[in-house]
Amino acid sequence: MTKSTVDEIRERFDADVERFSNLETGQSATMDSALALDLVARTAAAVTPHAKDLLDIGCGAGNFSLKLLSYLPGLSITLNDLSQPMLVRAGERIATQTCGSLARVQADIREWEPGLEKFDVIVAAAVLHHLRTPAEWEATFTKLFNALRPGGGFWIFDLVKHEIPTVQETQWSRYSDYLVDFQGNGYRDKVFAYIEKEDTPAPLTYQLELLRRV
């Protein structure tokens, strides 16, 4: 199957802002979204308690930045997303919650250069599964590692694929059950259809090995 283009992905997210705007539930099509929000924010704050600058890749409507602000008040935040409506909503929600600076960058992370040693914390939540090739994974991880200050942290929450088929089938079955319980068979089919069309998740072990290499 031919995967979605960048423009097609942007258009879908432009029309789906509300689903990404609830801090209590997180992104509802994702299992354990609210738990992940808190775990990432709480752990990032513990690891880098004196963090000043946050980069939120694929920020959506800003949930991860907002949750991090609850643990690290006053952060200066750079928001990055393909979708301008998402960036607008994220900026509106965050601007009143921090005394730090706020920047918004509408760009594909594959094409944007965030700079060298500019951030203490980088978060990439449900975005890296849009990377298509090993070269894109390596280039993106390299630029994000280079954008971290010494002692900084890079935090990922994402859809992953498992190398062992039976494990993949088991986790996919559990995800199916979650979606059906949440909104029924039709919703499950809709989510699975756009994952098939749009996403190219990589195994966790692959990502860890690549992070060590870069």
Per-range role (PLM):
Residues 138-150:
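A short glycine-rich, Lys/Arg-flanked "PGG" loop and its adjoining helix->strand segment in the class I
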Residues 1-48, 67:
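Conserved class I S-adenosyl-L-methionine
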Residues 152-154:
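Short glycine-centered segments of the SAM/dcSAM-binding site in methyltransferase folds
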Residues 123:
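A conserved beta-strand element that flanks and buttresses the S-adenosyl-L-methionine
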Residues 157-212:
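C-terminal alpha-helical "lid/dimerization" subdomain adjacent to the S-adenosyl-L-methionine
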Residues 53-57, 61-112:
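Class I SAM-dependent methyltransferase SAM/SAH-binding core
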Residues 126-130:
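Short catalytic micro-motifs in class I SAM-dependent methyltransferases
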